[in-house]
C-alpha cells in the first residue's frame, strides 16, 4: 500500500513538538506492515540546509500565487517530498512564528499551499507515483481533504490525525477567496466555522477517518471541556473516530545503549542508575544524598500544569524530596520556578531552555517524573520515563491515563502498576500523589517493582503502526 503523509514538521529535520516525532517515526514503523509512505513537508531553511541529492518531482508555476517545486529525497530512513517554495517558507523564525514570536500573517496561505500541493500529488500529478491513501496531520495539513473533495481528485480515502485540538487554524472569512476553492465550499459542511474559515474544522468534515493520539483523548474531545468548540463537529463523526496511542523510537530511547547516558543499565542492572543520578545532582547543584529526585521536563505553560509545580515546590522540599526542572515557556512561570531554586539551594534546580541530551540523562538518573498536564492528547515524556525506569507521576487525563497504570492496591498486588495517577489536577491532588511516591520510595523492593514493570511496558511504535495499517486497509478496501 502507498500512503502520502502530510505534515508541517518531521523529526529529525524540523521539530517544535510531538507532531514531528509521530510524522518521523510512524512511516518507518509502517514498513513492517507493507506500507510505503512518502511524507510531504514544507521546505523551511532548516530542512533545505540538510537535504542532499534531491530530485525534482513536480513543479507548480502558480501554487496559490507563488512558484513551488516538489523535491524527493531519502533521509534517515524516510522518503521525503519537500515543498520548496521560498516565498512561503524561506524566512527567519520558526515554522509558524516570526523571530519576535508572532504568527506569520500569511500562515493561512503557507499551509493552504501545502495542502493544495498534497491534493495534486494525490490526484496523480507526480509522475510514476500515486498514493492509495492520504494521511494528514493537524490543522496545517487539514485542508488537503477539502481540496480533494472539491477538485477533480480521485476519491482516495483520507485520514486526519488530531495531535492537539487546541490548535485549529482559524482565520477571517476574507482569506477564503485566496484559497481558490469553489464558493459553495464555504458552508457548515466544509470549512465555514461561525463566519470564519476553519482549517481543522474543514478537515474534520471531509476526511474519511479521524484519529487522535490516545483513546482517552478521543473520548475527551467529544466534551465541551476538551473539545475547544469543535465537540459538536466531532460528535457528528464519532463513528469514524479512532484513538491510537503514539509510540516512541526505542532505539533512540534505550537506557542500555543511549550515548548520552553516562552509565548504561537495564531491568536487571538498575543500580547502575546511581552514576547518572550523581551527574544530575552535579548539573543542577543538588545535595548528593538519598532523597528522591523528582523531575519535570516540559514546556513551562498553564496547560502543562507548571503553575502547580511552582506552587508545590516548597512542599516537595518540606516532605524530603528534591526537584529539578528543565524547560522554557511563560516568563512568569520561569521566574516562579527560578525563585524556588533560589529559596532551596541544593534541593531545587532549574534549567531554563531545552537541552535534548540533558532530557535523556534526567530520565536515566531521576527517580520520578512529574507530568501534571491539564490536558494531554498523548504525551511522550511519560513513555520515556517508563522506558528508563523513571517512575511517572501523571494527571489522569488523555494519553497519560492510557499509558500509565496507577499503583493502587489491586495493581500493586497483581504486579502490573507502572506509575502514579492523580486527579483532580490541583495542588492538593499533586501533593497527594507525591506523598504516595515518597511512601513507595521508602520501600526499595516496591519502588524497584514499579521501575521494572514500567520498563517492561511496550512503548514502541509496533502496536500503533499495526493499528494504523489496519485502519488504512479497511478504508482502501471499502473503496472510499
From Swiss-Prot:
Q: Which reaction does it catalyse?
A: [(1->4)-alpha-D-glucosyl](n) + ADP-alpha-D-glucose = [(1->4)-alpha-D-glucosyl](n+1) + ADP + H(+)
Q: Where along this sequence does the record place binding of ADP-alpha-D-glucose? A: 15
EC assignment: the record states 2.4.1.21
From the broadest rank down, the organism's phylogenetic lineage runs:
Bacteria, Pseudomonadati, Pseudomonadota, Alphaproteobacteria, Hyphomicrobiales
Q: Which family does it belong to?
A: Belongs to the glycosyltransferase 1 family. Bacterial/plant glycogen synthase subfamily.
Its Gene Ontology cellular component terms are:
cytosol
Protein's UniProt name: Glycogen synthase
Please give the CDD domains that the UniProt record associates with this protein. Answer: GT5_Glycogen_synthase_DULL1-like
Amino acid at each position: 500500500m502507498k500512503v502520502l503523509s502530510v505534515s508541517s514538521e518531521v523529526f529529525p529535520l524540523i521539530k517544535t513538538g510531538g507532531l514531528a516525532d509521530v510524522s518521523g517515526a510512524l512511516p518507518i514503523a509502517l514498513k513492517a506492515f507493507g506500507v510505503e509512505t512518502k511524507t510531504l513537508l514544507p521546505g523551511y531553511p532548516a530542512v533545505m540546509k540538510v537535504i542532499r541529492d534531491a530530485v525534482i518531482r513536480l513543479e507548480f508555476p502558480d501554487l496559490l500565487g507563488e512558484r513551488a517545486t516538489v523535491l524527493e529525497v531519502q533521509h534517515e530512513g524516510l522518503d521525503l517530498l519537500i515543498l520548496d517554495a521560498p516565498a512561503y517558507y524561506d524566512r527567519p523564525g520558526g515554522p509558524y512564528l516570526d523571530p519576535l514570536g508572532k504568527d506569520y500573517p500569511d500562515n493561512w496561505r503557507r499551509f493552504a499551499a501545502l495542502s493544495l500541493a498534497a491534493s495534486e500529488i494525490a490526484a496523480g500529478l507526480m509522475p510514476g507515483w500515486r498514493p492509495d491513501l492520504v494521511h494528514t496531520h493537524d490543522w496545517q495539513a487539514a485542508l488537503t481533504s477539502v481540496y480533494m473533495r472539491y477538485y477533480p481528485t480521485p476519491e482516495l480515502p483520507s485520514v486526519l490525525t488530531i495531535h492537539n485540538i487546541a490548535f485549529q487554524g482559524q482565520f477571517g472569512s476574507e482569506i477564503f477567496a485566496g484559497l481558490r476553492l469553489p464558493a459553495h465550499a464555504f458552508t457548515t459542511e466544509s470549512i465555514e466555522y461561525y463566519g470564519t474559515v476553519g482549517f481543522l474544522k474543514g478537515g474534520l468534515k471531509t476526511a474519511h477517518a479521524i484519529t487522535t493520539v490516545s483513546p482517552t483523548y478521543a473520548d475527551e474531545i467529544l466534551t465541551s471541556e476538551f473539545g475547544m468548540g469543535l465537540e459538536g463537529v466531532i460528535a457528528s463523526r464519532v463513528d469514524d473516530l479512532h484513538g491510537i496511542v503514539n509510540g516512541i523510537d526505542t532505539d533512540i530511547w534505550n537506557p542500555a545503549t543511549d550515548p548520552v547516558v553516562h552509565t548504561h543499565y537495564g531491568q536487571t542492572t538498575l543500580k547502575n542508575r546511581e552514576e547518572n543520578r550523581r551527574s544530575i545532582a552535579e548539573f543542577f547543584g543538588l545535595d548528593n544524598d538519598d532523597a528522591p529526585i523528582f523531575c519535570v521536563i516540559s514546556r513551562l505553560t498553564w496547560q502543562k500544569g507548571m503553575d502547580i509545580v511552582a506552587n508545590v515546590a516548597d512542599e516537595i522540599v518540606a516532605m524530603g524530596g528534591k526537584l529539578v526542572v528543565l524547560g522554557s515557556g511563560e516568563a512568569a512561570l520561569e521566574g516562579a520556578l527560578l525563585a524556588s531554586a533560589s529559596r532551596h539551594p541544593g534541593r531545587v534546580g532549574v534549567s531554563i531552555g531545552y537541552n535534548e541530551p540533558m532530557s535523556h540523562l534526567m530520565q536515566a538518573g531521576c527517580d520520578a517524573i512529574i507530568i501534571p498536564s491539564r490536558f494531554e492528547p498523548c504525551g511522550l515524556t511519560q513513555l520515556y520515563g517508563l522506558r528508563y525506569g523513571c517512575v511517572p507521576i501523571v494527571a489522569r487525563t488523555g494519553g497519560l491515563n492510557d499509558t500509565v497504570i496507577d499503583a493502587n492496591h489491586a495493581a500493586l498486588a497483581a504486579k502490573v502498576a507502572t506509575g502514579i495517577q492523580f486527579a483532580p489536577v490541583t495542588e492538593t491532588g499533586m501533593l497527594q500523589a507525591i506523598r504516595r511516591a515518597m511512601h513507595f520510595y521508602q520501600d526499595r523492593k516496591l519502588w524497584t517493582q514499579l521501575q521494572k514493570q514500567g520498563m517492561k511496558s511496550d512503548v514502541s511504535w509496533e502496536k500503533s503502526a499495526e493499528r494504523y495499517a489496519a485502519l488504512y486497509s479497511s478504508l482502501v478496501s471499502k473503496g472510499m
